[in-house]
């Protein structure tokens, strides 16, 4: 199914590039972005990153840049480079605050780090885990405000841990 979706996206993207009015620079940026998405969907992360970075060099539109930055964050997150992932998610959000998926992914990283810290069972790590859980909650609440029907697992965790009230 993924291969069909990738091919469909490529065909639609090619048609859009031909029929929509766009500058040469916009078309170039979109071509890099499209190549990055294709490589990313096939797990070729180095190639995807290269294309995304090329897209950022020529893309001027903040909205379009936000999705490129978001996808770079996805790759870093998928490869365990969480500090870089957080950096790119935050950059994406600075250009486009309406990215609940970036907020969710930030929360997932903080939640995962909190669980890891909690498992160490030393006082300093217990406090760190509480801070990280609170950060995860903060980002999940923001994501749920933008996309109330998404992230049911996050909503449940927030309710169970007492971090979600009727005011959130």
Curated annotation (Swiss-Prot):
Q: Which InterPro entries match?
A: PSI_Ycf3_assembly, TPR-like_helical_dom_sf, TPR_rpt, Ycf3/AcsC/BcsC/TPR_MFPF
Q: Show me the TPR repeat boundaries.
A: 29-62, 66-99, 117-150
Q: Identify the GO cellular component terms for this protein.
A: chloroplast thylakoid membrane
Domain of life according to the entry: Eukaryota
GO BP of this protein:
photosynthesis
Keywords (alphabetical) are: Chloroplast, Membrane, Photosynthesis, Plastid, Repeat, Thylakoid, TPR repeat
Q: Where in the cell is it found?
A: Plastid, Chloroplast thylakoid membrane
Q: Which Gene3D superfamilies match?
A: Tetratricopeptide repeat domain
Report how it sits in the membrane.
Peripheral membrane protein
Q: Which residues form the signal peptide?
A: none
Function in brief: Essential for the assembly of the photosystem I (PSI) complex. May act as a chaperone-like factor to guide the assembly of the PSI subunits.
- Its family? Belongs to the Ycf3 family.
Protein's UniProt name: Photosystem I assembly protein Ycf3
């Amino acid at each position: 199914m993924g291969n069909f979706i990738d091919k469909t996206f490529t065909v639609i993207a090619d048609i859009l590039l031909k029929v929509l009015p766009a500058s040469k620079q916009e078309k170039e940026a979109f071509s890099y972005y499209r190549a990055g998405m294709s490589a990313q969907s096939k797990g070729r992360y180095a190639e995807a990153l290269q294309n995304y970075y090329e897209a950022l060099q020529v893309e001027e539109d903040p909205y379009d840049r936000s999705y490129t930055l978001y996808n770079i964050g996805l790759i870093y997150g998928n490869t365990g480079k969480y500090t870089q992932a957080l950096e790119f998610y935050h950059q994406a959000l600075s250009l486009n605050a309406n990215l609940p998926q970036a907020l969710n992914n930030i929360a997932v990283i903080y939640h995962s780090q909190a669980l890891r810290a909690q498992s160490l069972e030393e006082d300093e790590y217990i406090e760190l885990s509480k801070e990280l859980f609170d950060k995860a909650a903060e980002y999940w609440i923001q994501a749920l405000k933008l996309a109330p029907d998404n992230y049911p697992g996050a909503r449940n965790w927030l309710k169970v841990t007492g971090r979600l009230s009727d005011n959130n």
